[in-house]
Amino acid sequence: MKKNQVYNPFLPLYEYIPDGEPHVFGDRVYHYGSHDKEGGDTFCMLDYVCYSAPVEDLTNWRYEGVIYQAKQDPRYPAPQYMYAPDVVQGNDGRYYLYYCMGGDYGQGGYQGSVSVAVCDTPAGQYEYLGVVKNPDGSPMLKYICFDPAVLNDDGTIRLYYGTQYDYEERDDFLTNDFYLQDEMQMFGRSREEILSYPDSIMG
């Protein structure tokens, strides 16, 4: 069978799905990611959609439709935006979508958790399940939690996620020794390197 050349962009020009997470489930590749709105006021304004293609033909992408809507999360007030998600197949054979809610800068609060939705198929209609919890059963809350990545490591589900320390927004960030020591250790940078950035080591 003759195969076509794979090229970018592989999605339609009207689709903006950054932070992509491709996964092979069965004989298809499923592409998940955040969903930007053309001309939008900020990023991640649209609900999650999914595209898939046969593993053997990555030129033949199919629109699977909207798989999850921000309004399905009962815990978060408007504006409801969702940062980049990830999907993993659980040990029970179902598919779990991990995501973090976002919003306009300074709105909606920053103390968030990693939420979970579940579906019987990779690109079906996901339903809200709950939040990731600490061992004591309390919600795992992090300051500006975003872009979780999750994998099934031979039966153990491993979750990784991005975050930002709230002290990076404080007026005394560049003069507080505790904050500076934390940044130096986290990024492997000297005090001088940290202080050379006007806002934070993250730019």
State the predicted function of each range:
Residues 1-203:
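Carbohydrate-active catalytic/glycan-binding domains of CAZyme proteins
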